[in-house]
């Protein structure tokens, strides 16, 4: 029965994505992080912000787990059908496959129309780097990198934790991931208060990132991209990133499409030097964005089937 709930959550994400007007736990988690960060910065200063960052992590993840568990508990007390609906809905909100694909498609269409200024604004909504001076190729690369990375932490990882611990654990993971995306930067403003969140996100994504690489390789073979290069580049360039995890899915995509990703970018006005991922020399355009979206859908579907099969064998 639980497997049916997980399947329903996955299907809902495939069909609906994340409608902007719907209530969403991740929005609430984001608001909680903003509120806690403001309070903790008023209390702690200097090196004590490292301790504050630990508190921020514990409070955010702990409150997310407690509230989501209580909502499920309360709904079960009221009616079983309500419990099922809440369970499925909470699980669905942790998945970002369709939403990610839609945002990438918007950028792809804008680039195809030749509206570079609008494309810069759109890509700025899904990446952390400065986008006001990006070329069309750089926008395409940024979009591809984001889709590749979020195949891991926006789909594979939530599915992984959903199958292990249900919506509560999946939402706790999303809290970790949201913390990293909001405060896990290495600049002066966030280095201290975001240190714990960044490290815990690395730990939480350690297994999912490598699973994402594996699923993307399989997807590459199925879609008749360069599956062998996807495997090889994912392994060869796995350390070519400031994150211990991101290069796995990015390398798989770069190899599959025969392109080069990564390199030096600007974040909050500061230049961050990064090694490249992949060894392809062909220009990157909106065509490769479309191919990356295909990889996202295929790898996500493979992941769900694999996790569901293992769940059936074990339970």
UniProtKB/Swiss-Prot annotation:
<comment type="similarity">
    <text>Belongs to the CobD/CbiB family.</text>
</comment>
<feature type="transmembrane region" description="Helical">
    <location>
        <begin position="54"/>
        <end position="74"/>
    </location>
</feature>
<keyword id="KW-1003">Cell membrane</keyword>
<feature type="transmembrane region" description="Helical">
    <location>
        <begin position="203"/>
        <end position="223"/>
    </location>
</feature>
<feature type="transmembrane region" description="Helical">
    <location>
        <begin position="152"/>
        <end position="172"/>
    </location>
</feature>
<keyword id="KW-0169">Cobalamin biosynthesis</keyword>
<dbReference type="GO" id="GO:0009236">
    <property type="term" value="P:cobalamin biosynthetic process"/>
</dbReference>
<protein>
    <recommendedName>
        <fullName>Cobalamin biosynthesis protein CobD</fullName>
    </recommendedName>
</protein>
<comment type="function">
    <text>Converts cobyric acid to cobinamide by the addition of aminopropanol on the F carboxylic group.</text>
</comment>
<dbReference type="InterPro" id="IPR004485">
    <property type="entry name" value="Cobalamin_biosynth_CobD/CbiB"/>
</dbReference>
<feature type="transmembrane region" description="Helical">
    <location>
        <begin position="78"/>
        <end position="98"/>
    </location>
</feature>
<dbReference type="GO" id="GO:0015420">
    <property type="term" value="F:ABC-type vitamin B12 transporter activity"/>
</dbReference>
<feature type="transmembrane region" description="Helical">
    <location>
        <begin position="295"/>
        <end position="315"/>
    </location>
</feature>
<dbReference type="Pfam" id="PF03186">
    <property type="entry name" value="CobD_Cbib"/>
</dbReference>
<keyword id="KW-0812">Transmembrane</keyword>
<comment type="pathway">
    <text>Cofactor biosynthesis; adenosylcobalamin biosynthesis.</text>
</comment>
<keyword id="KW-0472">Membrane</keyword>
<dbReference type="GO" id="GO:0048472">
    <property type="term" value="F:threonine-phosphate decarboxylase activity"/>
</dbReference>
<keyword id="KW-1133">Transmembrane helix</keyword>
<dbReference type="GO" id="GO:0005886">
    <property type="term" value="C:plasma membrane"/>
</dbReference>
